[in-house]
Regions:
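An anionic, turn-rich surface loop/hairpin at beta-sheet edges
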Residues: 47, 80, 159-163
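Short, conserved active-site entrance elements at the starts or edges of catalytic domains
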Residues: 86-124
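N-terminal mature ectodomain segment of secretory-pathway/periplasmic proteins
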Residues: 1-67
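Gly/Pro-enriched, hydrophobic low-complexity segments
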Residues: 70-73, 94, 114-211
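Short structured motifs
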Residues: 12, 26-27, 103-109, 162-165, ...
Length: 216
């Protein structure tokens, strides 16, 4: 699974389609990621969000908004808050850690999903600091791709439900065209993350991971 989803560096041109139950809005952005400690995102649309930037370095995240012309540090428990009204937290959006390095797993059995036989696995976090202490995933055993994921708190409360859809081949990997997130602490909401373009193992200029990029 890691072989399909993870890379040393990654570039994404994508959209977040946020449905809060009353209206739908779309955010367009470009993101660059290096390992699990560095990522930078630039928001292109809509007009009111254009120029918004997010920079993650280790466990700290800075957000720059052009209408205030200042940057805000988001750290600690604030990383778990909803990002720009979506079903993703800031942590969800910026996290890119290998499953095998963050969790230990066991196979619970088989289950049919959408006419396909899947393996059901339970994953336990190796570190107490992980937001999601347990994951339950449904995996295509032949293609080794995740089809569905449930993310739980330490208490056992279901926090997030994620569906992985429309896998396609990208650089000898299978990667979903879209992921559908549902924050289970909200009602009647969902956020679809569309990957319009994704490139793996790309060269990323060092300036993208410097606070100096958080300027107008």
């Amino acid at each position: 699974m890691d072989k399909n989803l993870w890379a040393n560096t990654k570039f994404i041109d994508g959209r977040l389609i946020i449905d809060n139950g009353r209206r739908i809005r779309t955010l367009s952005m470009e993101s660059w990621m290096e390992g699990v400690t560095k990522s930078y995102s630039y928001y292109k649309a809509p007009a009111r969000e254009r120029g918004t930037k997010m920079l993650k370095l280790d466990r700290k995240l800075w957000m720059y908004t052009p209408h205030t012309d200042r940057k805000i540090l988001i750290a600690g428990h604030l990383l778990r808050q909803s990002m720009m009204g979506s079903d993703l937290s800031y942590e969800d959006m910026m996290e890119d850690e290998k499953i095998s390095e963050a969790y230990t797993g066991r196979i619970d059995g088989e289950e049919e999903m959408e006419g396909m036989k899947t393996l059901v696995m339970t994953l336990q976090a190796k570190r107490k600091t992980k937001t999601y202490q347990m994951l339950k995933i449904w995996v295509d055993p032949i293609k080794k791709i995740v089809l569905k994921e449930e993310a739980y708190a330490k208490s056992g409360k279901l926090l997030k439900l994620i569906h992985f859809k429309e896998y396609r081949k990208v650089d000898n990997r299978l990667f979903p065209r879209k992921m559908i997130f549902r924050d289970m602490l909200k009602e009647n909401t969902k956020t679809t993350y569309m990957f319009d373009e994704i490139r793996f193992d790309v060269d990323i200029p060092s300036k993208y991971f410097s606070q100096s990029i958080l300027k107008r």
